[in-house]
């Protein structure tokens, strides 16, 4: 006669003891049971949730769009002063070091964001990274941080120059202010504002890439 213990094991096929008798390891949530519900696929410790990966890709797209728009506006920023004495001179973005700095920073961030968009699409479509995982995490976070500081410093310096031009503390060619070159000043200010937008989005990207890096360092791949 079977003992109550063995009888209980026979009535409860989900216990580990039953799995040991028939040679099949059965887990409590039905994993490994034929016809049982499939367990959800677990994410690797060093990976973000799919929604977070999509959000990161969206931030890359916004960074690219804002930095490209700022780059184009600054690169085409040229105007002719309107002086009452009849002396007209052309003012260009290359006349100011800080504006050249903004253009260079936006160009670098634009190219970097474009490359990151390609890498992000590859990961979403293929499910794997182009570079080794450890290198990819450090690459993304390091460049996000570095380029965020780069474009922020460029915008900060250019904002001071734009303000001083408006207040006539700095004169264009030593004699003109924004009253005589209003279109030039306005385009420069718009370009700086868009560059600040690019900084905001790449800074948010660095938060996600930093979280992914810390998660990978603590929990492993």
UniProtKB/Swiss-Prot annotation:
Q: GO CC terms for this protein? A: plasma membrane
Per UniProt, subcellular location reads as: Cell membrane
Top-level taxonomic group:
Eukaryota
> Which parts of the chain does the record assign to the membrane side Cytoplasmic?
1-54, 123-144, 211-221
Kindly give the Pfam families that the UniProt entry links to this protein: CASP_dom (PF04535)
Q: Region (Disordered): which ranges?
A: 1-21
InterPro entries, sorted: CASP/CASPL, CASP_dom
The way it spans or sits in the membrane comes to:
Multi-pass membrane protein
Tell me the residue ranges located in the Extracellular compartment per UniProt. 76-101, 166-189
What are the alphabetically sorted keywords of the record? Answer: Cell membrane, Membrane, Transmembrane, Transmembrane helix
Please give the start and end residues of each transmembrane region: 55-75, 102-122, 145-165, 190-210
Q: Which PANTHER family match?
A: CASP-LIKE PROTEIN 4A4, CASP-LIKE PROTEIN 4C1
Q: Which family does it belong to?
A: Belongs to the Casparian strip membrane proteins (CASP) family.
Q: How does it assemble?
A: Homodimer and heterodimers.
Q: State what protein this is by name.
A: CASP-like protein 4C1
State the species of origin.
Answer: Pteridium aquilinum subsp. aquilinum
């Amino acid at each position: 006669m079977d003992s109550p213990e063995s009888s209980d094991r026979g009535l409860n096929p989900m216990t580990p003891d039953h799995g040991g008798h028939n040679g099949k390891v059965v887990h409590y949530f039905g994993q490994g049971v034929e016809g049982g519900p499939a367990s959800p696929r677990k994410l690797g410790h060093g990976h973000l949730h799919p929604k977070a990966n999509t959000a990161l890709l969206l931030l890359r797209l916004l960074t690219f769009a804002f930095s490209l728009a700022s780059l184009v506006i600054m690169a085409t920023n040229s105007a002719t002063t309107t002086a009452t004495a009849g002396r007209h001179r052309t003012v260009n973005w290359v006349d100011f070091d800080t504006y050249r700095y903004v253009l260079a920073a936006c160009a670098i961030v634009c190219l970097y964001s474009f490359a990151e968009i390609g890498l992000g699409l590859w990961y979403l479509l293929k499910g794997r990274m182009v570079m080794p995982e450890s290198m990819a995490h450090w690459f993304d976070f390091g460049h996000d941080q570095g380029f965020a500081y780069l474009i922020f410093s460029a915008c900060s310096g250019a904002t001071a120059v734009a303000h001083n031009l408006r207040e006539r503390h700095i004169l264009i060619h030593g004699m003109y202010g924004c009253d005589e070159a209003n279109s030039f000043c306005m385009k420069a200010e718009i370009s700086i504002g868009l560059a600040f937008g690019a900084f905001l989005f790449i800074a948010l990207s660095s938060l996600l890439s930093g979280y992914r890096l810390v998660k990978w360092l603590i929990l492993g791949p």
